[in-house]
Every structure is written in structure tokens, then in C-alpha cells.
Amino acid sequence: MAVTINTLREYKQKGEAFSALTSYDATFAQVVSEAGVDVILIGDSLGMVLQGHDSTLPVTMDQMVYHTSCVARGNKGALIMADMPFMSYGTVADALDNAAELMRAGAHMVKLEGTDWMKDTIEALSERGVPVCAHLGLTPQFVNKFGGYKVQGRDEKAAEAMIEHACELEAAGADLILLECVPAPLAARITQAVKAPVIGIGAGSDTDGQVLVLHDMLGVTTGRKPRFVKNFLAETDSIPEAIAAYAQAVKARTFPAEEHTFKA
């Protein structure tokens, strides 16, 4: 049975964790979905892991549409979420046009990075039938504003602001919240504060779901490994087995463990 946003809501209500993983092509989309992963994210992370850039900023709408269409052809029942790349949703009009392209390519949901300035955009998309995931915390498209890739929400003022933003974006129509590089206690507070399912990456084990970049969890990413990453291929004999092990570990809440978590 195909995973939908209602499936994720039911998981949250039952306290069952769900898994998400990036994919960028038809072959991996099939492998990931058949391994039991609930959500496939076509991330603008492709700019780094596929194209070799040092950020996600160079990724274009045409590239996101292309990879979304590839994933949609290979997918076997996972919910497909596509990133809207840098400045593709700077205005409501741009967001509507570009989200339509991704939905036509096969996405079931789009993901936007930002805070309360996105309320009008999320409301406009939601009213027109486009499900939205709001990405808070470390938002890679803002790397130049942050001065690097850093944990967000470490002081109480920033934490309270993030909780407020999550509630405001849910009220505007966000169906899903994604928290990246957020202290685990704050992620737990946000997960409890909103009715929408919350996906974490580097946000502890108390969120409703977990997401990783495919290349990271297979141990093939070069350079510095983020703290929240685990190499599942190192413990298995094949890529499909590694992906299935990841999905099972998320479901059992054995991943992320303490060593993958930011406490403060």
C-alpha cells in the first residue's frame, strides 16, 4: 500500500517511527522503497553528493524536476518529497509555479527552508493542493547567513523562536516539519507542540521520523562525517540490506543512538 501524508499522521498518533532517505534516480528509488523506507526525499543535497559543489545553492529547478521525475518512475509506494531549491520560492508566485513543476514531475509534497516569512507561501500552496514540509533548524540554503553548518536552537531564546515558528507554519498549512541539527530536547518539545509529523536529522530520537542522505548512510561520502550519520553498509552485506537495516533501526528507535545526538 502506498504511503501518504495520512499514513505518517497515523504513525504519529500510534507512536510508530517512520523512515525517510534521499534518492535521486529510478534505480535507488526502487531499492529504497522496496526496502521499507516510508519517504523518499529528492534533496537539493544532490548538489553536494552528485554534483560536487560545497553547498546546495547551485542546484536549479530544472535539475530538481529531472531528478524528481527519475525517482517517480522507480518508486514502489513511498511518499515522494522534493526540495524546492534556493530562491525558487522567494515570492508566492514563484513558489506556486515551481511547486507545480515538481508535482507534475511526480512529487507528492514539496519542502521549503525558512521560518515565519514562509507563512503566506505555505498557505497559498496548501490552499491549492500542494502538501508542504517546513524545514527548520539548520537550513543549508542559509549557510552563508549562518556562517557555516552549525547546530541551531542551542539557547533558550532561539529554542522558543523555533517552537513558535513550527506552530505558526503548521497553522499556515504545513503538513510535515523537518528539524535539522537541533538539540534533542528541543526537537522533542517541537514534536510534542505540533500535530504534524516531525522528521529529524541530527535532532535526536524523539521525533516522529528520521531522514538521512543516502550516500552518508552507505558510508561513501567523502570528507568530514556529520555526527548524526551512521554507516549501515559497514554492518551488512549489500546496499539493499543496509537500507532495510536503516529502516528497521528507525522503526525500532535504535537509531539514532546517543552518539548521533546533539544534547545542547
UniProtKB/Swiss-Prot annotation:
It holds the Pfam family Pantoate_transf. It is found in: Cytoplasm. GO terms for cellular component: cytoplasm. GO terms for molecular function: 3-methyl-2-oxobutanoate hydroxymethyltransferase activity; magnesium ion binding. Its main location: cytoplasm. Homodecamer; pentamer of dimers. This is 3-methyl-2-oxobutanoate hydroxymethyltransferase.
